[in-house]
Amino acid sequence: MFGIWDLKPKIKMTSTCVECPVKGCSQSVERQHDHFRREERYYCPDHKIYISPSTFEYANEEDNLLWKSKPDLDLLKAIKTVKRESRIARDNSEDALTWNIFRFLEITNQLGGLLSWLTQMEHAQTELIYWSYSQKTKEAWS
């Protein structure tokens, strides 16, 4: 995962090309228009990302995740059975942000404490529902 310090403050682009957003990279790719596409002509082979004028997407979505042990990836795979779409591989992905923060709170058993602090009520037991997926029932939550 690239951090803010790994990226150029501004990327150069023309009507036909966009440069790779990673500092020190001189690769340029064809400029995407309209819809984001994962095609070779938009790919930086040095950094394994697909580039558009406004975002980039990792070729491997795991590269955008902080929590990617086998149990984490198994859970993510199960979640995708009920989740309609995923943009978790995009650099500015709300899905990746949600996963990285809430998975941390869940793994470190801090979710109940955070909820108790936010609501000023005790929350001894919590169940985190990721995108309508219940880990308890292993299906869409209802």
What is the role of each PLM region?
Residues M1-S142:
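Charged, terminal alpha-helix-loop-beta segments
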